[in-house]
Amino acid sequence: MILVDANLLIYAVNQDLPQHKQARAWWERMLSGTARIGIPWVCIMAFLRICTNPRIFSPPLSPEAAIAYIDEWLDQPPVQLVAPGTGHWAILRNLLLQTGMAANLTTDAHIAALALEQGYSVYSADNDFRRFPGLKHVNPLSA
């Protein structure tokens, strides 16, 4: 079971990024496979925020185009949205206290807590996930 970080979704969509070709090929393989894929709500929001922002991408995606990508992904059988369960806060709190991290890594800690709570491995090009004890992190672009 894989939990996908926003950076891989952004790389898979934005053709101007150097990671695009590799990320797109990986994402298409995942979507056509049988492994259970979770996308956290926070990553959906990050995808929308970043891909539609003209200060980040020129040209940015229109809101309609960004939403169409998300709808397409969510229509795939192995894909589901992932929300925190009842044990999420305890796991997140422990990760933050164990690592002494918060600030810019708070969202990463939230994603790590989702993965630990629900049995996922985090797939991300962000190697900061290695900092969280007990979390399985895979960078599919480093292979």
Put a short name on every predicted segment.
Residues 1, 112-143:
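Acidic, PIN/NYN-like endoribonuclease modules and their adjacent C-terminal/linker elements
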Residues 1-3, 7-39, 54-68, 143:
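Short, well-structured N-terminal submotif of metal-dependent ribonuclease cores
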Residues 5, 108, 126:
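Acidic active-site catalytic centers that drive phospho-/nucleotidyl reactions
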Residues 33-34, 76-77, 118, 132:
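Structured helix-beta-strand junction loops
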Residues 36, 78-80, 136:
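Conserved beta-strand segments of alpha/beta enzyme cores
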Residues 60, 78-123:
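Active-site neighborhoods of divalent-metal-dependent phosphate/nucleic-acid chemistry enzymes
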Residues 73:
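Ligand-binding beta-strand-loop-alpha-helix segment within the catalytic cores
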